[in-house]
């Protein structure tokens, strides 16, 4: 749940009323306030509440080359909604020499945590399964432009990309990464399982 200040700043940024730097300042302020609350409640591990993210998984997955987002409209409970889904567009890899917003977000959180004794910053990232769920099951693709139908090669590259990304966070002082994976719930969804069967 994002604070109203961030929601309003995001809206203003989208409408061109404020700059990216001004939006970041609002996020910084709210994240610092959140960490202060977490410490006050004696939590040994603190997070930034994912306050910088628009989507819990896509903002993270966009850190990888070969992965992009696709804007769609979808009817949900009778209402037309704008949604984004991830799509594999090329070879998936993590380039640590590029500028990564998620690493910058980590650096700021880490700097806040270091102000408090006995407090460790925790980085939350989405699990790799979301790449496959979005590209194959949500979008109904049976192959990718780069890998074709060779899913095993894609799996290998995604695993390597995650290893390289985690190593980069380690180099930036991260010692606690939480990998969030919501895909387990799909395993008890008959509609989902039928989609898996249909895709082979």
Give the ranges of each region predicted by the language model.
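Domain-level signal for soluble alpha/beta catalytic cores
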Residues: 1-200
């Amino acid at each position: 749940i994002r604070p109203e200040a961030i929601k309003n700043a995001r809206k203003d940024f989208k409408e061109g009323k404020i700059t990216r730097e001004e939006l970041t300042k609002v996020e910084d302020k709210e994240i610092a306030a959140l960490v202060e609350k977490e410490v006050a409640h004696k939590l040994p591990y603190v997070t930034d509440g994912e306050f910088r993210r628009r989507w819990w998984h896509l903002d993270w997955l966009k850190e990888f080359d070969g992965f992009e987002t696709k804007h769609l409209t979808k009817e949900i409970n009778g209402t037309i909604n704008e949604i984004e889904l991830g799509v594999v567009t090329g070879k998936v890899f993590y380039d640590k020499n590029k500028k990564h917003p998620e690493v910058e977000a980590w650096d700021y959180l880490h700097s806040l945590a270091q102000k408090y004794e006995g407090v460790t910053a925790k980085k939350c990232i989405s699990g790799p399964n979301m790449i496959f769920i979005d590209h194959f099951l949500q979008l109904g693709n049976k192959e990718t432009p780069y890998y074709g139908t060779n899913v095993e090669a894609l799996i290998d590259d995604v695993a390597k990309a995650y290893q390289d990304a985690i190593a980069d966070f380690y180099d930036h002082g991260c010692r606690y990464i939480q990998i969030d994976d919501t895909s387990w719930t799909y395993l008890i969804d008959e509609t989902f399982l039928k989609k898996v069967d249909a895709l082979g």
